[in-house]
Amino acid sequence: MTSNENFENGFDLPPPDDSAEDLKLFIKKFERSLNSALLEFDENNQETIENFRQAKEHKMRFETECDQKLRNWKRLAIEREVSEEQSGEVQFPRWIDEWANTKLGGIFERIFSKMDSMQNDMNSRFDAMQTEMSVMKNGIASIKGEMAEMKGEMTVMKNDIASIKGEMAEMKGEMAVMKNDIASIKGEMAEMKGEMTVMKNDIASIKGEMAEMKGEMTIMKSDIDSVKGETTTLKGEVTAMKDSISQLDRKIDLLDQRTEERFNNMAQTMQKIDDRSCKSMMLTRKYENMVRSDMHYSAVPVPFLNGDEPRDYELPPLASFEDIDNLTKEQCIQYLHGYGVNKFSPLETVKLKERLQEAIGLWSKGHESHKYHTF
């Protein structure tokens, strides 16, 4: 007899002829090819969780299609054998329906055994996937713990910096007091110079009276010489004090320069730490959204690279694909700039929304069919 059944199988197996025996042989070859393909699926799809899910879904669809084909072909094999018995092509009498399994070489038993094996395999793989999801959740919890420790260390570092700033403020206060003392010394030196001027006037007055005091000239000269000696000593001391003050001024200038350099270096270091912390927080939120989206939970806000939150710029929150689809083009571009995505064409529409979806980690196999609208 002739049949029009579709024997396209995906394994390049030639279709059977119209005999029941050849159809049973075709079924056995298909089962072996199917087992080999399933084993290859298991071996080649363990690299990442995403690939494993995709392979799992593809495998389940493939198993369902193949199971349906097997059922149709086995039903066809029974019909053909019954037809051959009725036409006299088979050399033994037709048996009742319950003996069909025996006439086909125990094929029903093998079908049910294979179905049980496939069900057990699917259950074990589902359990393995749940175990992997549990491991992933534990990993995320560990990352959150490390981030909390890092925040604690950052708090300690900020406190140390505040302490250093306080000590520097105290040092500046002491420097101000020292400058006031130096100014006071300079004022006293000015007063001393005034007194020296008065002394010079007194000496001039003494010289005017020398004509009247010739008898006391010798004594006056001795007094004047003594005064000159003391004046010379005082000038030397004043010169030494000026040198000390000049050296102190140079040291103060050098200390101010070094202090400013240290503050600049410290500011640069703090900026680098803030940049890295902001980027780390952005990536952590992105990976968290990937897991939440895969589990059909709403996305959490992802901070920008500079540490600011989107709400600081009065941008609407993004918790789902619909929120992205409702953005204006200006809001979408502002979001992309905040996440460091700057290379795109101004003519893009749907592609901009897809870039923003990837930037915040809003992605799941279950949402691949979502289509965005143009602006």
Curated annotation (Swiss-Prot):
Recorded GO cellular component terms are: cytosol
| Membrane-traversing stretches | none
| Record flagged with keyword Transmembrane | no
Give compartment(s): Cytoplasm
Key words, A-Z? Cytoplasm
Which InterPro entries does the annotation name? Mug135-like_C
Q: Which family does it belong to?
A: Belongs to the UPF0612 family.
**Protein name as catalogued:** UPF0612 protein C569.003
Q: Which organism is it from?
A: Schizosaccharomyces pombe (strain 972 / ATCC 24843)
Species classification: Eukaryota, Fungi, Dikarya, Ascomycota, Taphrinomycotina
